[in-house]
UniProtKB/Swiss-Prot annotation:
Belongs to the mycobacterial PPE family. It comes from Mycobacterium tuberculosis (strain CDC 1551 / Oshkosh). It holds the Pfam family PPE. This is Uncharacterized PPE family protein PPE69. Residues 375-399 are annotated as: Disordered.
Amino acid sequence: MPDPGWAARTPEANDLLLKAGTGVGTHLANQTAWTTLGASHHASGVASAINTAATAASWLGVGSAASALNVTMLNATLHGLAGWVDVKPAVVSTAIAAFETANAAMRPAPECMVNRDEWGVDNAINPSVLWTLTPRIVSLDVEYFGVMWPNNAAVGATYGGVLAALAESLAIPPPVATMGASPAAPAQAAAAVGQAAAEAAAGCGMRSAYQGVQAGSTGAGQSTSAGENFGNQLSTFMQPMQAVMQAAPQALQAPSGLMQAPMSAMQPLQSMVGMFANPGALGMGGAAPGASAASAAGGISAAATEVGAGGGGAALGGGGMPATSFTRPVSAFESGTSGRPVGLRPSGALGADVVRAPTTTVGGTPIGGMPVGHAAGGHRGSHGKSEQAATVRVVDDRR
């Protein structure tokens, strides 16, 4: 639609409006682009036609004929698109020519401004010269309003009309492309678009769910940390009570330590008394029969009786200390009358009673603090222990 403002604007305003743009530079760039695109479409159509003609001889069957038909239709559509593009450079060329014509036909804005300036000066000095400038003022008005204004308005309107027509030519849509070899291509494209939209929605849902789970995990972690902090504070509060409970057994152990100190001090004295009470420790060969009997019987009363029979020596440390005695070890040889059948002992074989010397007890002088032992065989009484001589059995297997 042409601009209706051409007739309403002043001549200088229309001229400035037409020349205020970029001129024909953008028109020329657009014309070159359309020309290049049309040439490309023509070249593609020609190349496709040559390829079809070269390979159609090797196509067989109904499918080959359908393919050749589709290629021909596509090439025709491409050439139709190239023809639609070929019109555009001519349209742009017409617009360039219209702009140049309008630019040349327009009365320049400086000329229009000079007319108006002179008209104003003449009107200012006309009374002083007795209105002798009135004819000049009228001619200036006729030139401005009768020539400049109508001219520029007409040129602008004409140029606007040409551009409106060219715009309608440019608005013609391109030819519709024919269906290709795959009729299901549009449906597949629509399905692909739908699938992409569904995947995008699913991705957004998964991200939202992950963010929710992450937020929940963060809250749970904070709750767990709070519980751990409370447990640490509780254990810190219980530490003084545990220290008090540990100090109580240590305080109870102090009296027992005081009781153990005198006993530890008495241990060297007890060791010394035990040394004097053992005759064998001082090199004495004999031991008191009464003490031996007391050790064998294990009775406290028997030990007291034998100690009284031995001479009543004084004991250090009181009457509760038992006498030390020596017990003869058991013989390693069995007796000859053990009940098992044995052979006759040959003459000349030695028995245990011949080999073993009689055991004697050597009496000694009493030592202070130790009872005196009796001689061997003295005062054995009913507490004596009968001894049986051990024999050695020798079996001669040489016969």
